[in-house]
């Protein structure tokens, strides 16, 4: 796995994994939040987790909800979010995207990142951006694409005017993700 020259201390492992007895998820997250702030001069603005991590947090004693009569129940996702925010931690986003080869992000890691930006914000964040190039297809006058709209994905449909009446869909794009500051990401193993 390539770390893109991120400082090793920004890839910690919880002293006690969060599914084990005696784990301190809130303490771990506060420690990592402070480490992130010491490194970057700002606190993280987002926390990205898997569904498995939400389940581990919901079942942790620190997150259990005490019921009338002394019983308790595991926290809901909303309870977990509220407890994290009450402890000065960034909002949690559950990321479950998969590809044919498996999850996009490891299920056992918490990511602390800068705040999310709008997907149309071309400048991205200090962490990085994705830049769209302009293809030759986009420059073809037959498409009628305005110059400002040419960078990005070009998609079109053609239909053969003579038999066989076949429709053809074509697409073309140039995209380049650019990582500007890998130290704006902290990736901690917790499960």
What are these regions (language model features)?
Residues 2-87, 91:
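Extended, solvent-exposed, turn-rich assembly/linker loops in the middle of proteins
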Residues 15-20, 69-191:
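Sequence/fold signature of self-assembling virion shell proteins
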């Amino acid at each position: 796995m390539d770390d893109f020259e991120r400082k090793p201390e920004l890839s910690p492992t919880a002293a006690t994994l969060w599914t084990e007895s005696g784990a301190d998820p809130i303490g771990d997250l506060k420690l990592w939040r402070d480490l992130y702030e010491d490194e970057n001069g700002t606190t993280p603005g987002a926390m990205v987790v898997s569904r498995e991590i939400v389940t581990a947090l919901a079942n942790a004693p620190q997150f259990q909800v005490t019921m009338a009569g002394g019983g308790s129940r595991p926290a809901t996702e909303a309870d977990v979010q509220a407890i994290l925010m009450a402890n000065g931690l960034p909002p949690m986003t559950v990321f479950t995207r998969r590809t044919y080869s498996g999850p996009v992000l490891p299920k056992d890691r918490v990511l602390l990142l800068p705040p999310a930006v709008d997907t149309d914000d071309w400048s991205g964040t200090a962490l990085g951006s994705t830049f769209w190039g302009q293809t030759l297809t986009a420059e073809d006058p037959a498409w009628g694409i305005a110059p400002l709209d040419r960078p990005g994905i070009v998609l079109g449909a053609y239909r053969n005017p003579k038999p066989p009446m076949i429709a053809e869909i074509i697409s073309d794009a140039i995209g380049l993700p650019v990582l500007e500051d890998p130290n704006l990401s902290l990736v901690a193993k917790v499960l």
